Amino acid sequence: MTKITRVGSASPPDGGWGWMIVAGCFLVTICTRAVTRCISIFFVEFQTYFAQDYSQTAWIHSIVDCMTMLCAPLGSVVSNQLSCQAGIMLGGLLASTGLILGSFATSLKHLYLSLGVLTGLGFALCYSPAIAMVGKYFSRRKAFAYGIAMSGSGIGTFILAPVVQLLIEQFSWRGALLILGGFVLNLCVCGALMRPITLKEDPSGPEKSHDRDAQREDCKQASPYSPLTKEWTETRLCCSLQQGYGFLLMSDFVVLAVSVLFMAYGCSPLFVYLVPYALSVGVSHHQAAFLMSILGVIDIVGNITFGWLTDRRCLKNYRYVCYLFAVALDGLCYLCLPMLQSFPLLVPFSCTFGYFDGAYVTLIPVVTAEIVGTTSLSSALGVVYFLHAVPYLVSPPIAGWLVDTTGSYTAAFLLCGFAMIFSSILLGFAKIAKRMKRTQVPFLVKDSDPKLHLWTNGSVAYSIAKELDQKDEESLAKARTGCNLT
């Protein structure tokens, strides 16, 4: 069977079948991120049925989130080696199998492996290839296409949260997991929509491709143990790593990475413990599930409106500050949460936290681009999202241990709130220190020799200027006449 490749124009079509790709990615985000959020609705059911404490039960949600983030590069590798369609279909089968096997679990360890590892691995194989495919079909309207595709997370949470609660009441948690397993099989349909596209190459493309093939053949014919081949390969590998991941040595990026660890630690436990906390203060099951729905839909509003606002001319130069503001406000919401012990008070909390959660998630790529530049943005974002994996894994169990130890949610929520506030303060101090360092440079230049105003490379350039001053004027005149004659 021959593989059919579709050849388009030299640039992405920005429409056509691309809108089906957007629809497919929209459904993928519903079946992955929204379903992951709704697993927290099963928390009380798992805890009651297996008679386990908070920390042990929280590992289920942590493993799903961690596997989805940790194995995202594996999803890219599978889709590149096979195809995007095959990768997403395989991920859909694995995720559905994990949910179905989870419905027959007899212990939490079975849920760790089935609902945690297997389902999380399936989500990882689907999530990153679907997002990458949108970028292949869109160029000018890429941001708008991504806005529609990524909104599936919030919309899916808004719809699925009350539906999952209803399924649990009607069919128990086992029946609800079984039905979710069938629902997640729609990922295979989404994978079928991801039709590959091959863009026309430039006229010089075939020659370049031919040259690359010739070089590849020469490398194959060369002995792998040749010292020259080995030295060239090692040099090329070091240069490519330095160009692709040189930002890891930047102090600003190191500060961002540390702040992301604290931010990810703070934001994750709420999606696990909001429903159990609401139930513990006397809120009904339907109202607790509705709080998750509110959180999801307001998250979409934060994504769209905050991104639009920071694109305005008045705020465009203050995106970094807006990011810090959003993260800090989510931390303040955490600090206020232990005092909110009724449904009318928890609704404004869900709205506020959901809005600013969507706000700073939108600005993460923007802040990263300001630090590393657009050239290394793709690699830097991969590292930033990879750093979410460990906090997503450990923060819910730590919060659960605090609940078991103290008998209340106060300590867990306060720790999460202070973690997010510290993340914001850390980036803020780094920004202030960098600005103060810049303001000191003009004062140093004013106090130095006036010739430094003409040279930008410091002492080396000044020594060159000094040598030119010591040159004999006659030799310089002869040099000028010689240039004129030639």
Curated annotation (Swiss-Prot):
Coiled coil: none annotated. The keyword Transmembrane applies. Residues 201-221 are annotated as: Disordered. It is a multi-pass membrane protein. Creatine uptake is inhibited by carbonyl cyanide 3-chlorophenylhydrazone (CCCP) and by valinomycin. It catalyses: creatine(in) = creatine(out); guanidinoacetate(in) = guanidinoacetate(out). Detected in kidney, choroid plexus, testis, lung, stomach, large and small intestine, spleen, fat and parotid gland. In eye, expressed in cornea, ciliary epithelium, lens epithelium and lens fiber. Belongs to the major facilitator superfamily. Monocarboxylate porter (TC 2.A.1.13) family. This is Monocarboxylate transporter 12.
